[in-house]
Amino acid sequence: MPKQMAAPGKRRVRGSSTGRPIMALLDLLGRRWTLRILWELRGAPLTSRALRAACDDASPTILQTRLDELREASLVELMPESGYGLTALGLEFAENFMPLVRFAERWSKRAAN
């Protein structure tokens, strides 16, 4: 599967003929392990090994591919002494994602009834 994503206007976006920013973001977030990586990095930077363990031993190859994509999208950065962490933009994403997490909790309780 060809690598697609990053900055709108630079590449085609899977599932979109427009390449609008929201479509590019949803394309990136919809890739396997992407949301999990962002979720695990929300608290503190992690080394590759710690991140892999936190991600239920995801394949090192796919984990590295996703980290590269997230770095290209400016959501994650490699910090020399502490491993991978969220950038300022990544932290902004995590902050904006939390209302969806809270909604999912409420939805889960209602769906269980």
Kindly give the residue locations of the regions a language model identified:
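Membrane-interacting alpha-helical segments
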Residues: 1-9, 54-66
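N-terminal helix-turn-helix DNA-binding core of bacterial DNA-binding proteins
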Residues: 15-62, 73-75, 84-91
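Amphipathic alpha-helical dimerization/coiled-coil segments
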Residues: 2-9, 16-21, 39, 95-113
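Short linear functional motifs in flexible/disordered or boundary regions
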Residues: 49-50, 63, 102, 112
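Charged, amphipathic alpha-helical coiled-coil/dimerization segments
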Residues: 68-113
